[in-house]
From Swiss-Prot:
Main location group: cytoplasm
Lineage: Archaea, Methanobacteriati, Methanobacteriota, Thermococci, Thermococcales
Thermal characteristics: Optimum temperature is 95 degrees Celsius.
Gene expressing this chain: rtc
Designated name of the protein: RNA 3'-terminal phosphate cyclase
Family stated for the protein in its record: Belongs to the RNA 3'-terminal cyclase family. Type 1 subfamily.
Native source species: Pyrococcus furiosus (strain ATCC 43587 / DSM 3638 / JCM 8422 / Vc1)
Additional information: Generally, RNA 3'-terminal phosphate cyclases are ATP dependent, but P.furiosus enzyme preferentially uses GTP rather than ATP.
Catalysed reaction, written as an equation: a 3'-end 3'-phospho-ribonucleotide-RNA + GTP = a 3'-end 2',3'-cyclophospho-ribonucleotide-RNA + GMP + diphosphate
Amino acid sequence: MIIIDGSYGEGGGQILRTSIALSAITGEPVKIINIRANRPNPGLRPQHLNAILALKKLANAKVEGAEVGSREVTFIPGELKGGEIRVDIGTAGSITLVLQALLPAMVFAKDTVEFKITGGTDVSWSPPVDYLINVTMFALRKIGIEGEIKLLRRGHYPKGGGIVAGYVKPWIERKELIAEEFENIYKVSGISHATNLPAHVAERQAKAAMEELKVLGVPIEIKKEVSHSLGPGSGIVVWAETECLRLGGDALGKKGKPAEEVGREAAQELLSQVKTKACVDKFLGDQIIPFLAISGGKIKVAEITKHLITNVWVVEQFFGKVFEVKGGVGEKGEVRVVRKAW
């Protein structure tokens, strides 16, 4: 059994998500201790619990310590089968963070996995669903992963109620990812949404983002989406199309925050990524690590984050030396697979 210290590095829920996904993939039992030890409210939160329970079902696993507040979890995986996975987080807990745990395991299931998850689609401290659909999945297709994620309904803090569904097929053809530096940006796309709010909120967010992004001198198309759900909320995701991958920026609206500020924030986030010329933005940088370990390849990242370093560490607890990372936290960097996980 592999023992993972959950207080390592940034000590958040990511250690848990990656560890249990890798346990499910490898069939190697894992015990995670000191879960979220560095957080103000340590232990499992509802979205972590839901990720574990979904992986338990997917991997026919035995689990000990799976309850809110638990600081130690043991996961003993069985066989990764396909089928249907239903997850109701029950709060505005992040759907995308649950999917971050599920995706690496789902691609190793024997058959196609269909999923439907209810919770928060656009919430603080997690990737918005539009980023996952348009940036993360775009990158995963490059390495041979087939699947689709669809947004059925938005869910914001505190009520949630968002619904995301989709499917992932078994990963048969594993393509190496070489994504170092881009030369050209072809266009910028985006989605600006307003839920249970006036249409002008989405329009103002989009307009402000477009004003900032004009400096790139490329076509810009930001869709405006107005919808209804359990509670109000707004946000915007923008992404740049290059010859290698897509780089993204995003921002969430909140009460008292002008829509223009939200739009500018997302645009500035994107501009800070693309000025590095790295093919991989700082958000995708950590998300891609478990997949890169298996596909092989070499990437340049706009910024090495603590999340990336932590994910590298977790992968290497299972597989030994896999990566060579150049660059310090907060700097542009490079990640190279020196030995594929398998």
